[in-house]
Amino acid sequence: MKVVSLRRIYSSEIYKLPTTRLHMDTLYYYYFVSHLAAALFVDLPITEWLGGSLSCLSGLRRFYLSTYEDPILLIPAPWKTALFSSELFFQVPFFIWVSLRLRKKARDPVLWVAILIYGVHAFTTTWCCMFELFAEKKWMIMSFYFPYLAIPLWMAIDMGGRLVKSCHAAKSGPSSTITSKSD
């Protein structure tokens, strides 16, 4: 059985990230940074959880809710609580980690798998929210949510493509990166 060290492939000249991928990574970086801000200042009621001690941070959230009356944030439901807890405990730490990695222009398959997982997760959860907004005819709010639907979908497709391409590169790479291993 042939085993390929993917880390050696990425650190070698076999796999070079095309310029368009670097531009996409820059877009993803800004997406994650902006989504971190949106999560902390709009989506999550952090100031309410802290007892209103940071009321200056809740101004944007109050403005958004009073202006647009977003039913996803205003009307409680158990499934929404699950999504918000996911955002707090999974997405917020992930946004910080992935932003730092993308800023360093990391070419790491672990990063790509993580972004792929995030993309699928964010797309499916936002898809559910979009259906509720559609049912309530909240077109303006749907336009706010749309980038959080489209960009994660594109991320998932892009990262899946990168992983497939890297597997093909690893499979057809030089024999110096392939070692034989008996079963």
Curated annotation (Swiss-Prot):
InterPro entries: EXPERA, Sigma-2_receptor-like, Sigma2_recept. Pfam families: EBP (PF05241). The lineage of its organism: Eukaryota, Fungi, Dikarya, Ascomycota, Taphrinomycotina. This is Efficient mitochondria targeting-associated protein 19. It is a multi-pass membrane protein. Residues 24-156 form the EXPERA domain. The keyword Signal does not apply. It comes from Schizosaccharomyces pombe (strain 972 / ATCC 24843) (Fission yeast). One of its GO terms (biological process) is protein targeting to mitochondrion. The chain crosses the membrane at residues 26-46, 82-102, 111-131, 139-159. The gene is ema19. It comes from the Eukaryota.
